[in-house]
Each structure stands twice: as structure tokens, then as C-alpha cells.
């Protein structure tokens, strides 16, 4: 069990995914500074109820994030780029005096990523087209034969509901995740 500072957001971060944030609240600016000084990570958890500013109820599963780049923006904004690392189960949370949430987390066991099955090649082709239109992925190697990587990027880039994205994060098997993505896309492709 570990403790992580938490960043509740209206999004789901998958392992190996990229997340660009504009940070302005003092509690998160301080958290980012601490993470960068100590090479520590923070946890990204999707908001079930509430808002990003103020109190929020989160889902019980999230992903640790490592800051890989940052820049100062006008108006006291801090821009950061983080990459998703390990998924976790959020056991308990507490709110610090400055409003920052800290969670006790249990790291989820690593699931080896199989090669992409031939049946999922159309999903890899779709992802290739999507990634080409997303600037932050322009300089990222795209292992389109890696089932977990393909599934993770599709979860992030496709316009699925937050609830479905969260459920896909909680689906541990990459091939099962791809099957669920294909099923979710099916009505759109035939309609």
C-alpha cells in the first residue's frame, strides 16, 4: 500500500497515456512542485460526482502519473505534460488542510500485454488515424502491435462516456478491453 497525492479530473488516464494539464489552483501547483522536486508521481482519478474545482467524489480506480515536461503560461498558469504509469485501486482518501486529496492506494498487478490479434487490426488502423491528428502524440512511438497500448490510446481518444472509459480502465485484460471497445464502436460503424 502507498500514498499518492490525487488529482481528480473529468477524464480517465490510462497507463502509457499522455495528459496535458493547465494547473492554477495553489494546492495543485504545490503538488506539482513537490512531484518535480522528488521525482514523485501523483494519482489521476476520474470524478464520479462534483467538479474539478472544489469537492468531488471519485471512482475507486485510477492511474499514477509522472510529469515529463512543464512550462510556465501567462496568468500564473503552469502547463504540465504527464504520462500514465501504473493503475491502482483507491482504498481511502483524506483531504489535507490545503484541500489536496491524498489517497491510500493498492497497486494493481501488472498484466503482460499480448500482441495484437488479427481480429483487432482494424482497431489499430483506426488508432493510427486518430494519433496522427493529436499533436502531443506526434513524437511518440506508436507500438500498434501492442494490445494494451492500442486499447489504452483508443480509450483516451475515442468519444466514449466517462463511465465507459472508467469501466475500460478497470478491465484488466488488454484483449478483453479491445473486445469491449470493438463492441462499443459497432453501432457507430453500422449506423
Question: Which functions belong to the PLM regions below?
Answer:
Residues 1-191:
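N-terminal low-complexity, acidic/polar interaction/targeting segments
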